[in-house]
């Protein structure tokens, strides 16, 4: 089972990091890209079961933070690993989040109840800073 990671820039001018690992977590390849087409080219010929995206996928709140951002910030702010507020009034979320457009374009699911696989890949929104704090027992984000 391959896993793809996308450190998605919120706009298409900034650099986006992409990586692909095998079922054991070994890095198969990585790249720095800018456009959604380059992301598609990077993933072409591969079948990741899970796509971990460091960017908002589902944003429905008009202002402020999403509930998940509030919860995560409450728990990880003291480690300097809180989140930035995401809402539909932000220009970068118009007409919809870039990550959502990618998910829709590639036909990735977002329902965590599904069993991911090469034929039914699932995209997940991830927070690397808080993950590093939790996984490595850090006192502060790196």
What would you call each of these model-derived segments?
Residues 1-4, 8-142:
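RNase H-like (RuvC/DEDD) metal-dependent nuclease/polynucleotide-processing core
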């Amino acid at each position: 089972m391959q896993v793809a990671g996308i450190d998605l820039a919120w706009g298409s001018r900034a650099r986006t990091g992409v990586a692909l690992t095998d079922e054991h977590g070994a890095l198969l390849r990585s790249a720095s890209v800018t456009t959604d087409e380059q992301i598609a080219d990077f993933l072409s010929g591969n079948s990741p079961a899970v796509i971990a995206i460091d960017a908002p996928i589902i944003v429905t709140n008009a202002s402020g933070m999403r509930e998940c951002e509030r919860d995560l910030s409450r728990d990880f702010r003291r480690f300097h690993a809180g989140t930035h507020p995401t809402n539909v009034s932000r220009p970068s979320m118009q007409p919809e989040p870039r990550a959502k457009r990618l998910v829709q374009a590639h036909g990735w699911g977002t329902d965590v109840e599904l069993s991911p696989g090469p034929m039914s890949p699932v995209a997940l929104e991830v927070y690397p800073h808080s993950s590093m704090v939790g996984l490595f027992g850090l006192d502060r984000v790196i």
